[in-house]
């Protein structure tokens, strides 16, 4: 997850999903890693394009991008879109 302190939708994600994320099946399959938009881009993500929209959720497998969700559409739609990304990962 690419985030920044001044992002109201990052806070909304935290309020609506953040606490339960790691306890869900999807959260276990795609652990949430937080990267600050203004911070240094992690070395192991150098091959992944940075995003300027926060929050952005990038699903990475073996150093390759599977897909990304740009923005936070709300709790229910977030889970649906994340599941589509996980299904895409499974089909590769």
Predicted features, each with a name:
Residues 3-9, 53:
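Short pre-active-site segment immediately N-terminal to redox-active cysteine/selenocysteine motifs
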Residues 2, 25-42:
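Thiol-based oxidoreductase modules, predominantly thioredoxin-like and allied folds used
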Residues 42-49:
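Short amphipathic alpha-helix with an adjacent loop that forms part of the alpha/beta core around
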Residues 73-92:
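Thiol-/selenol-based redox modules, centered on thioredoxin-like
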Residues 10-26:
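Typically the conserved alpha-helix immediately C-terminal to a functionally engaged Cys/Sec
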Residues 53-69:
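A short, hydrophobic beta-strand/beta-hairpin element that forms part of a small beta-sheet core
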Residues 26-27, 49-53:
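Extracellular/periplasmic catalytic domains that process cell-envelope and extracellular macromolecules
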